[in-house]
A protein has these predicted regions:
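Hydrophobic transmembrane alpha-helices and their helix-loop junctions in integral membrane proteins
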Residues: 1-242, 246-272, 276-277, 282
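Cytoplasmic/organellar membrane-interface segments at the starts of transmembrane helices
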Residues: 82, 205, 215-218, 273-346
Length: 346
């Protein structure tokens, strides 16, 4: 625990320092940090060593903060040792804000045809592909629920970076949709992790046998969010991946499409292994020797599933994941299309 906290403190400080260093180089080259002024000034400085150095520092700084491969070292330990109430915040907010900041910085300041953006697309594309495959494959190795979710997040952040690397309307739409949808999906899964610890002290997926009988809402939340993470319709996760695939096809980036399909299959494998234990394990969690003692000492025992204060967030997450999927066309046409076409791609 203390080691993980110190690692996060150290890497977080490095990430923030790299961002500030990049901002310093940018100011040295342009004399301003106003984004509107920067967008005009950098046109004449494309290829400048200070601008290139600034962009490199920004990629590292944002990459550390959003746990983008290979700058993700702090994230698995943070999720493994953090308090259950903090995990949804880490997954839902802390790694999404720098992703949005990266979008604003690169696409609102630099033009798509510039040397800086060519470098950005190449670097972030490699990081995205490696991160998606690394996170998905590492998640297969673990039976600890939080470890699975932590490494899954590394892959999911890769989807956001892939949208940036695609760089067209569909790619950025997929990236923004995934920022929002993953915030709900992964928060919901970490809510279920906290609920399992609170109710039964469960950490391992091998301890989930027939838990759905005692915790139906928790199990439903886990199922909806996991299916959305895999990318099954009509949930939110399907549509963000759909737009990423459309953008990659439009650009002729078929490697990205192959990686999307492969990672979705890997996600299906590790989540269906969880479902197998949750719904199909013949021996119930109460009968298993490794969990019986924990359950007898449970804070809630065998009464109601959870206090209502803990149930409401999970119900909100279920509704959000479904509604974001059902109404995604309205979100894209009425909100994202004007913002992206008149802002990032103007």
């Amino acid at each position: 625990g203390p080691i993980a906290a110190f690692r996060y403190l150290l890497t977080g400080t490095i990430g923030a320092s790299m961002y500030l260093l990049g901002a310093g180089f940018l100011y040295s080259a342009t004399g301003t940090l106003n984004m509107a002024d920067l967008a005009e000034t950098v046109k004449d400085l494309d290829g400048s060593p200070l601008i290139i150095l600034s962009v490199g520092c920004m990629i590292v700084g944002f990459g550390i903060k959003m746990a983008l491969f290979p700058l993700h070292g702090w994230q698995p330990a943070a999720h493994s040792y953090a308090h259950p109430a903090a995990d949804p915040m880490i997954a839902g907010v802390m790694i999404k804000v720098p992703a949005y900041a990266m979008l604003r910085f690169f696409f609102f300041i630099f033009k798509e045809e510039s040397m800086v953006m060519d470098m950005f697309f190449d670097v972030i594309g490699v990081m995205a592909v490696c991160g998606i495959l690394f996170g998905s494959l590492k998640a297969l190795r673990y039976s600890t629920y939080n470890k699975i979710l932590a490494y899954s997040s590394i892959g999911q952040v890769g989807y956001i970076a892939m949208g940036f690397a695609i760089g067209n309307f569909y790619g950025l739409t997929g990236a923004v949709l995934h920022i929002v949808s993953h915030a709900f999906m992964k928060s919901g899964l970490f809510y279920t992790s906290g609920a399992l610890k609170y109710k039964f002290g469960i950490h391992e997926t091998t301890q989930l046998g027939q838990v759905y009988r005692q915790m139906p809402v928790t199990s439903l939340t886990m199922t909806v969010c996991a299916l959305s993470m895999i990318g099954l319709p009509p949930f939110a996760g399907f549509f963000s991946k759909w737009y990423l695939a459309l953008g990659a096809i439009e650009n002729g980036q078929y490697l990205f499409v192959a990686v999307l399909i492969a990672s979705s299959l890997l996600s299906a494998i590790y989540f269906f292994r969880v479902f197998e234990k949750l719904f199909m394990e013949s021996k119930t969690a109460f009968e298993r020797k490794d969990t019986a003692a924990l359950m007898e000492k449970s804070a809630v025992g065998r009464r109601l599933e959870l206090p209502w204060q803990l149930m409401i967030p999970m119900l909100v997450v279920i509704a959000a994941v479904i509604l974001l999927g059902l109404f995604n066309s309205y979100i894209v046409d009425d909100i994202l299309r004007p913002a992206i076409m008149e802002g990032a791609l103007s």
